[in-house]
Amino acid sequence: MNKTGYASDPFYLLHETEPHPENPGRLTAIQNRLESSEFYNNLTPIQPRKATVDEIANIHDLGYIASVEQNCADHNRNLDADTVISQDSYNAALLSAGAGMTAIDQLVDGKINNAFCAVRPPGHHAEQDRAMGFCLFNNVAIAARYAQKIKALNKIFIFDWDVHHGNGTQHSFYNDPSVYYASAHQHPFYPGSGAEEETGTGEGLGTTLNLPMDAYS
């Protein structure tokens, strides 16, 4: 029988963002729905670990990482107009980024066949040097680099299925032929990227695929 891992942690709820749309209620709703389902007891629990600064720095500038930590320590409320933070957001973001890497460890070790990571803050809008669209660190991009550097998984395919285009993830690998990034998203819509013509650059030309879709299509 295939084993599906489930990575989450109550600490994610301490990334306090109410009344922002990206708030702890999103994870609470997921957890409640899973617990009421017939397959919940068949999930393999995964306890996420915190990502290290070095692991985050595979994708993000060190200065940006330090600024997120400092803004949270200073009890600032926003990193930008869209991205709300609280005192515990930095550590929640480290734990969020670590979930994907923990899941990869278990996948490679044969303990699970696939995994679902219910984490926050989210990540696919986060750019190399800045927060964007509710996102602090690019969780998927960080996990992809970890899979390559630590687990020797040289070729990575990322499928991003979201109403919003994952600009940060795309930009992380736009000139990298070892990571194929595909996105299906509503267009035109936030953040304005993700046109069909965006297919990569340099050695990465042809390794980005965007599938912009009309609303309700």
Ranges and model annotations:
Residues 1-217:
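HDAC/HDAC-like amidohydrolase catalytic core signature
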